[in-house]
Amino acid sequence: MHEGYKVKLDTFEGPLDLLLHLINQFEIDIYDIPVAQITQQYMEYIHTMQHLELNIASEYLVMASTLLAIKSQMLLPKQELEDDLDEEYMEDPREELMQRLIEYRKYKEIAERLKEKESEDNQLYTRPPVVFEFKDIPEKITTNQTDISIFDMVGALKNMLKRKEWTEPHDTTVQRMDIPIETRMKEVLQQVQSNSDGLVFDKLFPSPTKNYIVVTFVAVLELMKDKQIYAVQERHFEELYLYSMEEST
């Protein structure tokens, strides 16, 4: 796959973000993490990103190894653990990861509050007076456009591939880009703009070929980054809809 079409995840904080995303998505108790479940879901995301040939930072793979190690340790018989460790030094194998997640979640919450305060201050000092009328209220109420993360998008693609159950196999290699990314971006944007009530994400993938899936997914991410479209998902695991930013203004 051409280097220019790879999507970098460096702008996202890393594997702890993905783990928190999964914990929220599956409504998991952060103080009692089901390691087998979270490891399976985490690995599915990693495999999907690898399938798309995304640039995955090494930290994601280190976390995958950590999860697998914790999972293996928890599968050991209790007596074997007691033989290896003095009882007073025994602790939950998940403890360190749990503490990292709790601290990181606190950091994110503080950062989000600071971001909201900064936004409020900017509106207070720079926003001109506006007269609101009922006719200005849009009929279509959507969720916060910033709520959708790269992990939501990868998850939507992962679930779409499962739902589609292609009758023909995917290509296993990307030999060349049959569709230039700029061309596919224009096609996707036109398709989204022609559906003012929202375009179901799955509708962008009529072809099971890997070339088509990768270039379409990258086109969607680029359009979102350029603030030409945005995504809405009312609830976890439900269909994801794409809207044109022009429709929301």
Swiss-Prot record:
InterPro entries: ScpA (IPR003768), ScpA-like_C (IPR023093). The keyword Cell division applies. It is found in: Cytoplasm. Keywords: Cell cycle, Cell division, Chromosome partition, Cytoplasm. GO terms for biological process: cell division; chromosome segregation; DNA replication. One of its GO terms (cellular component) is cytoplasm. Its main location: cytoplasm. The keyword Coiled coil does not apply. Belongs to the ScpA family. Participates in chromosomal partition during cell division. May act via the formation of a condensin-like complex containing Smc and ScpB that pull DNA away from mid-cell into both cell halves. Component of a cohesin-like complex composed of ScpA, ScpB and the Smc homodimer, in which ScpA and ScpB bind to the head domain of Smc. The presence of the three proteins is required for the association of the complex with DNA. HAMAP family: ScpA. This is Segregation and condensation protein A. The lineage of its organism: Bacteria, Bacillati, Bacillota, Bacilli, Bacillales.
